[in-house]
Amino acid sequence: MKRTYQPNKRKRSKVHGFRARMSTRNGRKVLARRRRKGRKVLSA
């Protein structure tokens, strides 16, 4: 059986990237939460 994590930069940013987060209402909520918490890195 192959491993579940097969790194791919393009997919990573398409799914978890900043622009992906900004494109939906819930994604913007995620960023707002992470800003409020004081996360150094907001998105992948």
UniProtKB/Swiss-Prot annotation:
InterPro entries, alphabetically?
Answer: Ribosomal_bL34, Ribosomal_bL34_CS
Q: Where is this region: Disordered?
A: 1-44
The keyword Cell membrane belongs to this UniProt entry's keyword annotation:
no
- Here the segments flagged for biased composition (Basic residues) are 1-19, 26-44
Keywords recorded for this protein, A-Z: Ribonucleoprotein, Ribosomal protein
The answer, when asked if Ribosomal protein is one of the entry's keywords, is yes
Family matches, as Pfam families:
Ribosomal_L34
Q: What processes in GO biological process is this protein linked to?
A: translation
Q: What does the record give under GO molecular function?
A: structural constituent of ribosome
GO cellular component terms, alphabetically, are: ribonucleoprotein complex; ribosome
| Family statement drawn from the similarity comment of this UniProt entry | Belongs to the bacterial ribosomal protein bL34 family.
From the Swiss-Prot or TrEMBL record, give the protein name: Large ribosomal subunit protein bL34
Taxonomic lineage = Bacteria, Bacillati, Bacillota, Bacilli, Bacillales
